[in-house]
């Protein structure tokens, strides 16, 4: 009797091996129905029943059979009671494929407690957190992602950026401009010194019609380092003290040289203070450095205000010709 049962189990083992081998070929061919059938048929006798059930679950999910996928997952959990990590990873992957993002996130939160540096857990958690807008949780796993080297430095940087912008938008949506300002004050100095975040914050404040704080952030940012993104924001701030911005711009010109951008921005600040002649001078300087349709239009306005209509008309013509040259098809 013992020999007979040994012969039977050996035969089943060999058949399971053959089925597993055939299943891998079908997997390469993309035939998920056959993959699932072959892997699950003698899974209990396979060399690694857990792997068979998990692959069968994924194959069933690939062809949209959620009931079979769940059955294979439950069976995998039974055959491998002492190590549930592979089962839960597969479960999370299947939930994400079904767009059940919150359930996947719950599953991954639990996995991160037991396997905080597991590359696949981190990769799936990134996906689940992005899909559910769990920005704080995403920020929290970035150090582990860095240590586990699951992605590039650039991708980590992009994720960090997205997470902070997501948190900023959340604060704005939930508590409006006051909540956003409070949120900003609560951040670390390092965060508040990130230029991309400063730019996003100022854009929000301009939208909320809070020029005072917008100006404070831009000026603090420029004090820390010169960045064209901050300079480009200045004309959009409806400043209660344009002379303060003018002073800062002149300082930037002394430090970094009179670039076309700095000249043009200074011209716009001078126009706000009705300093038409001074504004015309700096717009001219900017145009000597390079042609620009906006600068031609602003310079024409300055000439109008100082009683020089012919020169104003000439500048408008130059601006129009430039536009036509830049867009020949229109």
Which ranges hold each PLM region?
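Alpha-helical adaptor scaffolds
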Residues: 57-61, 74-77, 84-93, 160-169, ...
């Amino acid at each position: 009797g013992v020999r007979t049962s040994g012969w039977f189990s050996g035969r089943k083992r060999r058949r399971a091996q053959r089925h597993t081998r055939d299943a891998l070929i079908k997997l390469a061919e993309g035939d998920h129905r056959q993959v699932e059938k072959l892997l699950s048929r003698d899974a209990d006798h396979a060399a690694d029943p857990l792997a068979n059930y998990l692959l069968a679950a994924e194959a069933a999910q690939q062809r949209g059979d959620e009931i079979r996928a769940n059955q294979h997952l439950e069976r995998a959990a039974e055959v491998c009671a002492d190590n549930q990590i592979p089962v839960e990873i597969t479960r999370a992957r299947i939930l994400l494929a079904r767009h059940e993002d919150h359930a996947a996130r719950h599953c991954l939160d639990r996995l991160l407690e037991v396997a905080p540096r597991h590359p696949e857990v981190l990769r799936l958690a990134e996906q689940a957190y992005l899909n559910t807008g769990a920005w704080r949780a995403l920020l929290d796993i970035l150090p582990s992602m860095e240590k586990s080297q699951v992605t590039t430095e650039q991708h980590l940087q992009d994720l960090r950026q997205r997470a902070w912008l997501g948190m900023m938008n959340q604060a704005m949506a939930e508590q409006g401009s006051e909540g956003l300002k409070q949120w900003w004050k609560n951040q670390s100095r390092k965060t508040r010194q990130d230029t991309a975040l400063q730019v996003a914050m100022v854009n929000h404040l301009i939208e909320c019609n809070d020029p005072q704080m917008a100006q404070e952030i831009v000026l603090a940012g420029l004090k820390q380092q010169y960045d064209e993104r901050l300079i480009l924001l200045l004309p959009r701030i409806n400043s209660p003290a344009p002379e303060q911005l003018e002073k800062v711009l002149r300082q930037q010109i002394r430090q970094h040289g009179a670039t076309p951008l700095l000249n043009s921005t200074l011209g716009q600040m001078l126009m706000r203070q009705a300093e038409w002649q001074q504004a015309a001078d700096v717009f001219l300087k900017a145009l000597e450095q390079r042609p620009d349709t906006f600068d031609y239009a602003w310079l024409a306005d300055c000439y109008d205000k100082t009683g020089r209509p012919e020169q104003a008309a000439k500048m408008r013509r130059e601006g129009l010709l430039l536009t036509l040259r830049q867009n020949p098809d229109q």
